[in-house]
Amino acid sequence: MSVEWKFVDTNVLVYLFDADAPEKRTRAQELLRKERDCIVLSIQVLGEFYVTVTRKFAESMSLETAARAVDAFSRFRVQPVHPETVNAAIHRSRSMRLSYWDSLIVEAALSAGAGVLFTEDLQHGQRIDDLQIVNPFRDGD
């Protein structure tokens, strides 16, 4: 049986710890529980998570707690980012007018063979090559 990989963007992981967004926190928890066997992340996602929760929260997470969270997330499949991925992201950012960082997420998801990208940073329902963009926080879905 093959796995349909689903790529999870940084914002989904951040909401797991965001006390100021309880509804999104619950949705993120439900998503990770439901999809736990087919989740793929990237090195970029792990790094962005660490920086966001330790520097950008109203009440920053301790460095130790953030490091433990990154360690826990590392148990999911983690897609490496290779020079080819970076070059593809540069090209995509120019051709689709996406930010480089969003393009790198897209390219990592495609490289991982993911069919779905869970994010709130791109347009819900959009298809990018073989990748379906899904905003898990969108109302009515």
Regions found by a protein language model. Give the residues of each.
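Short, well-structured N-terminal submotif of metal-dependent ribonuclease cores
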Residues: 1-41, 56-64, 140
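Acidic, PIN/NYN-like endoribonuclease modules and their adjacent C-terminal/linker elements
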Residues: 1-5, 106-141
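Acidic active-site catalytic centers that drive phospho-/nucleotidyl reactions
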Residues: 9-11, 48, 102, 121
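Substrate-recognition element of Asp-dependent hydrolases with the DxDx(T/V) motif
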Residues: 40-44, 119
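Active-site-proximal, substrate-binding regions of enzyme catalytic domains
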Residues: 50-76
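Short acidic, glycine/proline-enriched helix-loop-strand junctions
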Residues: 66-70, 76-87, 95, 122-141
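Active-site neighborhoods of divalent-metal-dependent phosphate/nucleic-acid chemistry enzymes
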Residues: 75-120
